[in-house]
Amino acid sequence: MLDATTFDELRIGLATADDIRRWSYGEVKKPETINYRTLKPEKDGLFGEQIFGPSRDWECSCGKYKRVRFKGIVCERCGVEVTKSSVRRERMGHIELAAPVTHIWYFKGVPSRLGYLLDMAPKDLEKVIYFAAYMVIDVDEEGRHADMPGLENELRLESKTLSDQRDARVAERLQRLETDLAALEEEGAKADQKRRVKDTAEKEMGQLRKSFDEDIARLERVWESFRTLKVGDLKPEDADFNELLDRFGLYFEAFMGAEAIKRRLQAFDLNQEAELLREQIATGKGQKKIRAIKRLRVVSSFLATGNSPAAMVLDVVPVIPPELRPMVQLDGGRFATSDLNDLYRRVINRNNRLRRLLDLGAPEIIVNNEKRMLQEAVDALFDNGRRGRPVTGTGNRALKSLSDMLKGKQGRFRQNLLGKRVDYSGRSVIIVGPQLKLHQCGLPKQMALELFKPFVIKRLIDLSHAQNIKAAKRMVERSRPQVWDVLEEIIRERPVLLNRAPTLHRLGIQAFEPQLVEGKAIQLHPLVCAAFNADFDGDQMAVHLPLSVEAQAEARILMLASNNILKPSDGRPVTLPSQDMIIGLHHLTTVREGAEGEGRAFASVSEAIMAKDQGSLHLNATIKIRLDNYVPSDAADTGTEPVTAVVETTLGRALFNEALPVDYPYVEAVADKGQISAIVNALAERYPKVEVAAALDRIKDAGFYWGTRSGVTVSLSDILTPPNKPQIVAGYEKKAAKINSEFEKGLTTDLERRQELVKIWTEATNEVAEAMSANFPADNTINRMVTSGARGNWLQVRNIAGMRGLVNNPKGEIIPRPIISSYREGLSVAEYFIATHGARKGLADTALRTADSGYLTRRLVDVSQDVIIREDDCGTTKGLDLPIATVDAEGVLTRDPNVENSVFARTLAADAVGTDGTVVAKAGEDVGDVLIDKLVAAGVVDIKVRSVLTCESAVGVCAACYGRSLATGKLVDIGEAVGIIAAQSIGEPGTQLTMRTFHTGGSASADDITQGLPRVQELFEARTPKGASPIAEAAGRIVIEETDKSRKVILTPDNGDEPHVYPVLKRSTLLVEDRQQVELGQQLIVGTVDPKEVLRVKGVREVQKHLVGGVQGVYRSQGVPIHDKHIEVIVRQMLRKVTVVDHGDTDLLPGELVDRSRYNEINRGALQEGKKTASARQEVMGITKASLATESWLSAASFQETTRVLTQAAMEGKSDPLIGLKENVIIGKLIPAGTGLSRYRNVSVEATEEAKAERYPNRIFADDSAFSENDLSFVDFDSFSSDDYTPGTYN
């Protein structure tokens, strides 16, 4: 088999008949599969052992040769080669077709490649291929030209003869009529009798004339048709054509079916056609030019690859190996088989029948019908259902063809190549493990034993607990006590990976050191739950084992939970204490007025603890304590030395501060969610990861400990309804009644009434909510939960204890009658009914949103998967100017609110100069929190920073333009797959975005504004929004023209160009006034603008701003922080292609989409050779289109439209350079990112002397007990084999 590591490119091409015969090990001649009595494969059948190899290892079919010693012998009795049965997975066969057939992908795909090549409409092609019309293949021009006069004379003569004959026959009939009439006259017949005879005669003469005229006309038609006959003409099978064939069959050839296409293709001159097309493109206009460009693309791809176009017509069909289309016996003796076998059988049956008919010399019409059926059978095999009704099996189910095997989520690409199942893995339910350290997880003993089984077996043999593998296996299965000891020893320091599906971002897989636990559930550290989005209501997680030493090192260094404290999307900590921990710390750090022991002073924390244990001091009483390592809370940096001081605080706060690092400033505040979040933020910024993890564990332990002791419970008596609620509601009921009566009198419209009522009841709800929260005492548990941020919010409490308020109906409008009851009081039936509407819609919405968001993530990953950090610095001087400060009302500079997610963690592109002209920061410096504060203090308003949008790396991006990795807080490493991180960061919060299209004011009068997830999709797909606003094409003056039906905005440019007219709907809101001066690109009406227009009018930078700003707007509105750089990575991919407008003297085709880097490279080459360069226009592509336009055909095929991508790639003979990640996953190579980059793969390590000394300690002076059987910790077991080692001796 192919070894994935030995090749650098993968090419796909068109297989010729010779290629297929070369792959094949024999021809499949019979449609039989296996003999149902002997269950042996039939000879020459679809499973034949002679062709595909033996079905049992080292055993021929008849049983003459058995055993491996006959390897390679071909049995002379049955003709089967003695070899391994696995060859049945790789050996192919073939079917020799009795008539050629076209490949359906090239004929029926959109656009039809065959149609483009032969310049025929697909409808006409279909007529020829399926035997409804003849196609002229060849015309003997010279012969026809030479014989034309003679033939014409002959024809004229014949036509003259015919007309003479006609006249003679008519005259003869007339003569007879006269004779008849004379005879009747003599007999004295009546007038009507005469008339009858006359009519009959006239009718006969008419028929005579008609039949002769038809013959003459046919001659004319045939002659005309022969005179204008050219290659490629279609002729229906009728009398005219038969006549043409009889008379002039020597001068031309016409065929039906794939035979016709094949002959045309064989005679096709690609070079000449390419010349013609280039000429057409140069001179043509409009549709003609577009079609010529498309055709040239097909023609030039055949020229470039050297493929023969005739390979699109098949003479041989390959048969895939039988193990890939298996046939298995079910329990009842029936057989289950792959659909492919049925499809192959139809092909073989029809092929054999056609052969027999040809041998018998059957009439043409029968043979053609059989040929058509063969064509249809091969079509169904390749792509069932592409043309006509699909072939169905039992139960009217369409059979799965070869194309269906590749397509879609269940196809080969996505199911087996990108999503393999892996060994050394297990899954189980998770439970919380509060006793664990941040880098640990609890692994059930049984599960660990199963996972580490091979390692345990090896160690048991090494320690001579067992003599051989079988014995060791038996020991493991019987769980002997020694096994557990060995397992403990092995598991030490070996990380395992835990994963929770759905893995929405890279923190969904993290490494932990396993601790063996009893029971069957995996124990998870509470702080990593947020990253996994896990809870303990029955979630399951999977465990995977990194096997190789490199994998273990990577898991430990890169994936250990304690090294993944920051979120890659915004650089903020993800391991924030939550719920119980917060309530515990809140309980610990509150101050209680007048509590036991207030005002006392203590010499140390220990003394205060003793007082508390004696019961003379309350945890929350204000006291004075002498603290040894005190850093004042206003200390700016970590540099401040700790001092000894007497501090006024509470015992609880002193205990809380003991959980923080020694030199951390003393926290003198209530530890609610915000405070803890700020502390963890500061820890992550200032301390090394080891210390942060330790501090987090201490905070967690303190939180759980005091959370338990706080005794926080919820009972019905804690839910306090405000006593004045009835009075508040009654007051507003009066107001509402007044408005209703005004409406009944006809003073207001229904709309006004609704709006007023909504306003009134919103006020009422707010007033009840305020009364309710004022009514809660400070020590009420619900109040403590909400104010500390542990769980819930005031809205939920209002629903339970205040009033439910207004709700929406399914249309999204607000029902003007509120729900006055709270859940504590209970809802009436009517109230309950209207409340269910909104709630149910919410659930349905969430389900849809999850699917939508998942699909968005998939597209984002696909478009950005090959964006990898490839170099340190691309050397560009370009960058983006971004604001870092805003001027507030008093004229003071403050930090811009969006600084965190725009300039933070980037690299300066130019020196930042303060107001006094001094350089505050040099170009190339990293912009962190400290530097931002320094810049703002120096009066800098905006700075120029590097960005991936302006990066000039040819492949991937450079580290300097990307800036700091948000997950580590350091400059990004080379090999970091920033594209995938960007896709995950944008996709992961996708489920939190709303799905709604907001109706402004509850009525559909104004244009709906798309927001939430649909808006993000619209931006990333670069779609033209519904009701897009026009933008000013030039700077100029506006005139607004209104008629009673329509409204126009007319823009007169300042530079004297033609005025631009924009028709505008009457109901849309204008953003410009009459006679106003506008800038280039200014928006004219309220609504969203089309990114393609922005690009055309204002250029690349503006469209980048528009896309990044638009996506950020949606996420900010939902309070989801994402750094701009992630969105920029995606936008960079959307803008990387240009469309060639004029190809100059280069090899580019006009209208071709090329990568900007490749386009620049080609132009540079042309300049150096002094040729005319190409010109192009920038494109903005949606992410789906951009993914399909990738250089890698493997990646594109595994994304969407598999058959179309493969058809195109095979025709162009595309080579996949295997640069991206997906392609390498598919073929099973290490991905070229992270440690898979060649610069990391080829590193050689030199051990230092200290390391050697540590690894191989000098044992000469050790006491002899060091050589006892069990302590072999200094033996390097990885490189040790048990053959040259006997326990008890060490050589």
Curated annotation (Swiss-Prot):
One of its GO terms (molecular function) is zinc ion binding. GO terms for biological process: DNA-templated transcription. Coiled coil: none annotated. It comes from the Bacteria. Its cofactor is Mg(2+); Zn(2+). Belongs to the RNA polymerase beta' chain family. The lineage of its organism: Bacteria, Bacillati, Actinomycetota, Actinomycetes, Micrococcales. Mg(2+) binds at D535, D537, D539. It comes from Leifsonia xyli subsp. xyli (strain CTCB07). Pfam families: RNA_pol_Rpb1_1, RNA_pol_Rpb1_2, RNA_pol_Rpb1_3, RNA_pol_Rpb1_4, RNA_pol_Rpb1_5. Zn(2+) 1 binds at C60, C62, C75, C78. HAMAP family: RNApol_bact_RpoC (MF_01322). This is DNA-directed RNA polymerase subunit beta'. The gene is rpoC. Its EC number is 2.7.7.6. It catalyses: RNA(n) + a ribonucleoside 5'-triphosphate = RNA(n+1) + diphosphate.
